[in-house]
Amino acid sequence: LLVALAEEIMMRGYILGRLLHTRMNKFLSLFVSALLFALLHLFNPNLAFLPMLNLLLAGMFIGASYLYTRNLCFPISLHLFWNWIQGPILGYQVSGNDFGTSLLTLHLPEENVLNGGAFGFEGSLICTVLMIVLTILIVWWGEKREAISLAVPQSC
């Protein structure tokens, strides 16, 4: 779980934070940092196209949580919770890596694209849909929040 902490400090705290201080569009900055996050997992066991896409989408989701709060606590918490639920609680592989003993034991009838196969939940179509929906919700919330703060008159 310390890996999640290190990844968030590096990917969101440093890389996305620096990109947001350039003239680059915030969504392009978010995409670039998410792509680097996905590439960070390039040599994980059992990586294929769908898990790589989901890692990119997860990078967008977690990155958006930083983009709209500018607080590392939110993305770190999301990432830790995500990994903790998958591995130590449900017994899934986390990004292709086995966590060993878990609180619950999943008995999947077969490994396929619905359950993520050997890569774990992050290799599933369900994860793809979940990451897209969560990213849209974070961006919607963040844009709405920014619009409200811009509409409020500034005091002298």
Labelled PLM ranges:
Residues 1, 5, 31-35, 52, ...:
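Residue-level signature of the transmembrane alpha-helical core
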Residues 2, 111-132:
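Hydrophobic alpha-helical transmembrane segments
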Residues 6-32, 64-71:
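Membrane-interface helix/loop boundary segments of multi-pass membrane proteins
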Residues 12, 41, 79, 83:
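Histidine-centered divalent metal-coordination motifs
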Residues 40-49:
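Membrane-interface helix caps and helix-loop-helix hairpins in membrane proteins
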Residues 42, 87-91, 136-140:
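Membrane-embedded alpha-helical segments of multi-pass transporters/permeases
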Residues 51-112:
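Functionally important transmembrane alpha-helices
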Residues 137-152:
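Membrane-interface capping segments at transmembrane-helix boundaries
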